[in-house]
Amino acid sequence: MEIDVIIPLYKPGKELFTLLDKLGSQSVPVHQVILLNTEEKYFEQLIYGIRFLETYQNVKVYHVSKREFDHGGTRRMGVKKSSADVFVMMTQDAMPKDDRLIEKLVEPLQGEVAVAYARQLPREDSTPVESYTREFNYPAKSRIKSAADLDSLGIKTFFCSNVCAMYDRRTYEELGGFVESTLFNEDMIYAGHLVQAG
């Protein structure tokens, strides 16, 4: 099974190298990392003087203008650049806690689950409100959600986060993927379609 990681970028900093290193040392290997970079000049400044493509041989970089960027459309473009069986959507500030991120995300997709998102842990410098929000939205215990949860969870039934989420490609294609044009919540819109489809 091939697994690709797709990451939209905007003015990436040096933490991108740490993220790529962590993705390169996962217990379940990543086939390809697809970077969808907005505004080429910032990326070029970041990698100036280093052998980026030699160091990160499984990384492909595609540049998108700021005018063209759209949360749904840009991610759709990234999926089209991938041929993997499953793919992970991440943001540039998401950082794997350990080398088992991909392993843990792919486990539920072995059954009937079509998308799994990672738990976000609060940063050490988080405010109490930020910490509480992370704990509420990303509890320690995993849960499979379906239409049966609508009465108890309401709109939270559709919660999914492309900060770090793995998708089954076959189901993604069957449902038509992410909406073409959206400023935000492409992940929850997709999850809503998924829950409604059963």
Which residues does each PLM region occupy?
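Short, well-formed alpha-helical segments that are part of the catalytic scaffolds
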Residues: 12-25
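Acidic donor-binding segment of Leloir-type glycosyltransferases
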Residues: 22-63
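Glycine-rich, basic loop-to-helix element that forms the pyrophosphate-binding segment
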Residues: 65-82
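Conserved nucleotide-sugar donor-binding
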Residues: 83-84, 161-175
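Short aromatic/hydrophobic "clamp" motif used to bind/position activated sugar donors
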Residues: 87
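Acidic donor-binding loop at a coil-to-helix junction in glycosyltransferase catalytic cores
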Residues: 184-190
